[in-house]
Structure formats: C-alpha cells, structure tokens
Amino acid sequence: DNECVQAVRDTCKLLESLGHHVENSWPSALNNADFSGKFTAIWSTNMSVGRNSLALMLGREVTINDIELMNWTMAEYAKKMTATDYAQAVYLSMLFRRAVQQWWADGWDLLVTPTTSQLPLPIGTIRNMPESPMDALRIAGDWIPLTPPFNTSGQPAINVPLQWTKDGIPVGVQIVAAYGREDLLIRVASQLETAQPWAHHTPNI
C-alpha cells in the first residue's frame, strides 16, 4: 500500500531532522528472499517437534483438534521431509544470513522498511479454512514479507507505529540493526517516539 511506503519516507525525513544521515540502500539478498520453498523443511520439522513436545506435556497423543489446522498441516508435511531436505534448508538459511548481514558489515547502521506491505488487516481476514489450510500462511506471508528475513538472520528489529491513517489505523515502520545492537534500536526508537509520540493514539475497533 502507498501508505506503508509513505510511512517509511516520512520516518526517514524525521530521522534526518534529528541529525541522522539517510540513504536509499538495502541488502541485495532481500531482492530474492523466497522463504516459501527454501525453508519449508525447517518450519515443518520445527512444527512437528513442537507437536511432539505438546504430546509429552499433555501425556497423550495430540489430535487435529488440539492445534490450529495450519500448524497441524505443517507438522504432517514434515513426514515428507528427509534429513537431506532439512540439512539443505539449514545450509541455505546460513547462506542467506551471511548475505544479509554483509550489508551491515559494509558499514550501514540501520535499515528502515515497512513493517507490513498493506495496512492492518480486519479481524477475520486470516482464518484456518479446512479446504485450504495453508491459505493463512500465504496471506500472512504476503502481508509481512519484510519481517521473516530477520527472523531468519537473527537480527534485532523493532516496529514503531509512527504513522496513522485518517481512520486511526497505525502504519508500522520496521527498523533493523546488526547483531547485538539492540541498544542502538532502543535509542533511535526513543528519539522517534519523543519527536512524534504515539501513546495517545487509539485505533478504532
């Protein structure tokens, strides 16, 4: 959405007004960040392990009625994965992390992106549908394409609701730092909130 893009532009202008230097740059690895296929083996295997752990906690078999349908489907998909599939996904994940982190190693401090590609979705948009259990994951993936890369890379990131629509809907901006630089994120977010407070905003429900 244009409002998500504009939120980033306005945030960058605010950062400049606070004395920060802003340039148009990003990790080139993000241009081809396809998570749907490459890392399915990791996600589904982790879901299967989680389901097994839940069974141990409950002291019984976990049934399809115990967890969300999408999670159940992912756990079942893990049965199709081989050890080689999993190892390959872990290897690709490692390569991706290194490629993304190189941007920070080249001297950049922070990356500013939209938190979501669209404005916040109405309640009920993402649902578990028995006839298409993976639709929820697909919709979520289309909505938040720029947060999974940093879940994978393990870097600290923060979401700041600096912009608001005329209808009172928050428009989040994501700021990402290098490994171990949570201190930088908190300092910059504090500067932004002081300059443009958001605590008094209450979105309509």
What are these regions (language model features)?
Residues 41-101, 114-118, 123, 159-169:
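Short helix-loop capping/hinge segments that flank enzyme active sites or metal/cofactor-binding pockets
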Residues 104-105:
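Basic phosphate/pyrophosphate-binding loop/patch that engages nucleotide-derived ligands
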Residues 109-110:
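Short, Asp-centered acidic motifs that coordinate Mg2+ and/or phosphate
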